[in-house]
Amino acid sequence: MSQWTHVIATFRAQGIDHPMFPQINWQNRMSKNVPHGSEGPLQIVVNVSRDFGRVDTVVTVWGDLRDYDDEAEIMTYFTSIIPTPQQGAFIGEGVVRIRIEECGDDPEREYHYKFVGDGQSGEWMSIKR
């Protein structure tokens, strides 16, 4: 019997659409070290909207990873793709939900992106389900 890990995630980033400010290449940023099961990696869709001098980006990630159960590696990936304001984007909201089949009493985890300290940076915080 196969081990399956199900992932659904989304986050929203805001930036300034002006040559003075750094612009993020989301496809390049997202494509490094993507968690990968025996039948393929997580799927990624990036939607970018430019209006009134702003860049609004919504990133959606999902997938069913076969023969994979490394929750820590998934969260390391999500931590690595979040930019800082100095890199060109401010993360408004984010959520990651991971469900590992046949994982005992606590197979499902949810993480929310929360701001810490100065409000310029944040981290993924586990929400007990």
Residue ranges and their predicted role:
Residues 27-129:
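Charged interaction segments
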Residues 1-29:
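Short, extreme N-terminal segment that most often corresponds to the first beta-strand
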